[in-house]
Amino acid sequence: MEKNHPQQQRRNFLKGSLALGAATLMAPVATMASSTIAKGSEEAFGISVGPYLQTTFGNEMSILWITNKNAASWVEYGESADALNLKAYGESKLGLRPEGRLNCVTLKNLKPGVTYHYKIVSKEVVDFQPYKLTYGTVISDTGTFVNADSAKEHISFLMLNDIHDRPKSIPFLLELDKEKKNDFIFFNGDIFDYQTDEKQIIDHMLQPCVDAFAKQTPFIYVRGNHETRGKFCREFPAYFQNVGRAAFTLGPVRFVILDTGEDKEDAHPVYAGIVDFDQYRIEQAKWLATEMQSKAFKKAPFRVVMMHIPPRYSGDAHGPVHCTEVFEPLLNKGKVDLVLSGHTHKYMVHQPAQGKNNYPLIIGGGPKEGTRTYTKIKANRQLLSAVMFDDSGKEVGRVEVRP
């Protein structure tokens, strides 16, 4: 595999981010002393963040929110703001409905193309005794969303990547999107430097998303290698509907999302023998091979794969090399129309190259001003287009594919 400059650039970035700690990272971390937000009994019951929407379509929508104390929660919804006559709860396990602070309620069997109004409701659990449950304050918040028709003719979405604990970049880059019309926002990994605690997740991603779009437009999120790091990395997935692999259809596109894992070898001393990403990628490759044989994949006018570490052109570290070994042969055989990635911190468009990638590959930029990008993807049955812009709004790359 060819050796490129991106790996060294990433190392320089990481060194720089440590030096910047006092200004950009250490201050937030200093306020994140506890790994879970502990709330004293004197604090009023409330919503810490949310609601925020996530989905992989198929006439379902997940509504998530976090309360500052344990609660029983549900969603009331309907096609009119004055008639929220439907009710949904979080997934029951072993006959028990959820009771806690992290809430995820999935609305199912929604009507295609219909606007839904919803209200999240949480009822504080003041005292939980074996035969007596005492409730306290009830709180709520409202929102609306359109349930996208999976068979719609035209789709559009926006990709962001490699934000690296710079929360102001999220609304800044979204604001540059002139059309402001997206079926979803896609976060392609490394939104954080590493996982510290709940406050970091709220302050550096969830709250900026809620403020900008996430109460009415869903986002989809896959981990980058940095989300696999830090003391809170094992708790991190509970704050989202999904941060791993997925496959779904929207309009003329079959989407496949791969979780590329860590870029260091599993035996690296910093992981102390508690990771297994090589096997994880191998298992995903088997899953990908099965997905590529599915009718949904084969019959789609376009096939788009989204993965944080690119299948090539990202240096010679262990993770990128392993991604090339296990994923690229499948991508080349599977008639993939476009791959969207990040990781290198250097934006680039790689057109198909004989003996390498049979598909166009867009790699988004980095976290620093002047390197940040957003990528706008649109598709109908005749054309798939992806245009990458830098943080001045200037076009810096384009791919157009026809069936």
Language model features: what each stretch is:
Residues 43-66, 73-77, 248, 348, ...:
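Binuclear metal-dependent phosphoesterase catalytic core
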Residues 100-104:
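Short S/T/G- and acidic-enriched coil/turn segments that sit immediately N-terminal to beta-strands
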Residues 106, 117-147, 199-297, 326-335, ...:
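Extended active-site neighborhood of metal-dependent phosphoesterases/phosphodiesterases
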Residues 107-111:
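Short, flexible loop/turn segments at beta-strand junctions in immunoglobulin-like
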Residues 159-161, 185-189, 219-225, 305-307, ...:
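Active-site neighborhood of phospho(di)ester-bond hydrolases with catalytic His/Asp-centered motifs
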